[in-house]
């Protein structure tokens, strides 16, 4: 009787163990953004919604390399505080990126300063570790191309995204809730950092929402100013579709949001649903090797924002994405 009872119990135990996800040791590069606290809290203590615990099961942040930006004061001043906070969550501090990659299986490249991403990424790619790069992917379009090309050559899963991409209403439209999108308008904060392309620093959030619902196919960009003095960027997509990003104004465009018009109706887009929605996609990529955002779409998004800067330099003239991409590739050819 005892054996009859024990054998089924043993079988159930073995099945349960087989279904448990493989443990993954995560490492963080750059402790100069609040995102590291949000991600580490969700992975090491549990997501905000306990029902989502299975989406992060088996993944823990075990080590971090603190150095992020070297000269952006708003970033550098955060490092000591955030270092202590992640240590309190059980994270060990590594002496270098090279040291970090030896301790972990997967990487969050979180340095707020996009200019140092390529440098910090190289040891990660050399070690073959899957990596998520927080926005912006780089400080320039040329470096964005270098990063995407290097990951492809190394055959390492890599993607970059704002959490805004995975907001519920934005994803619904992306997945066809209003049919093919004919036009969309999004807004978000767009504070500037002189060392970066204007929209790379913060406007990328609203621009990412725009590309999530519009998809690829943007051909040209014109930059202007709203009636209340804020940034306005209008993109023309193939097939006569139009996408517009505007800087939020704290009034009728407050925070994050927007609207998409499709073949079968319209819907709100661009809302902020927290960091966990992005984190869950990162974990899926770490486990499957399948990226949720293609390199092509990411490159077009950053070309759109670079073209907006070029349009600004030309007094609001129309600038094609093909032009800024060619310029960036020429820069790479001159300085590989």
Language-model features: locations:
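Hydrophobic h-region of N-terminal signal peptides that target proteins for export
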Residues: 9-18
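N-terminal glycine-/serine-/threonine-rich beta1-alpha1-beta2 phosphate-ribose binding loop
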Residues: 3, 19-127, 152-153, 314, ...
């Amino acid at each position: 009787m005892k054996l009859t009872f024990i054998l089924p119990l043993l079988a159930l135990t073995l099945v349960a163990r087989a279904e448990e996800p493989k443990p993954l040791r995560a490492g963080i590069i750059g402790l100069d953004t609040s995102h590291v606290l949000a991600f580490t809290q969700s992975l090491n203590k549990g997501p905000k919604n306990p029902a989502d615990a299975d989406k992060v099961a088996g993944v823990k942040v075990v080590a971090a390399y603190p150095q992020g930006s070297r000269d952006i004061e708003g970033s550098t001043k955060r490092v000591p505080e955030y270092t202590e906070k992640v240590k309190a969550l059980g994270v060990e501090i590594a002496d270098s990126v090279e040291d970090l990659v030896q301790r972990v299986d997967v990487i969050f490249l979180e340095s707020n300063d996009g200019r140092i991403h390529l440098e910090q990424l190289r040891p990660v790619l050399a070690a073959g570790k899957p990596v998520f790069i927080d926005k912006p992917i780089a400080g320039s379009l040329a470096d964005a191309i270098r990063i995407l090309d290097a990951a492809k050559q190394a055959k390492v899963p890599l993607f970059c995204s704002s959490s805004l991409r995975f907001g519920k209403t934005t994803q619904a439209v992306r997945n066809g809730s209003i049919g093919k999108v004919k036009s969309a308008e999004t807004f978000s904060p767009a504070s500037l950092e002189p060392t970066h392309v204007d929209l790379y620093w913060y406007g990328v959030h609203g621009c990412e929402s725009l590309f999530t619902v519009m998809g690829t196919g943007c051909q040209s960009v014109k930059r202007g100013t709203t009636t209340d003095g804020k940034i306005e960027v209008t993109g023309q997509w193939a097939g006569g579709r139009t996408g517009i990003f505007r800087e939020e104004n704290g009034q009728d465009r407050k925070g994050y949001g927007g609207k998409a018009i499709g073949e079968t109706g319209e819907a709100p887009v661009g809302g902020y649903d927290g960091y966990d929605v992005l984190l869950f996609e990162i974990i899926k990529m770490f486990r499957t090797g399948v990226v949720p955002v293609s390199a092509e779409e990411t490159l077009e998004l950053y070309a759109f924002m670079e073209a907006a800067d070029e349009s600004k330099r030309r007094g609001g003239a129309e600038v094609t994405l093909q032009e800024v991409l060619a310029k960036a590739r020429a820069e790479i050819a001159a300085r590989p």
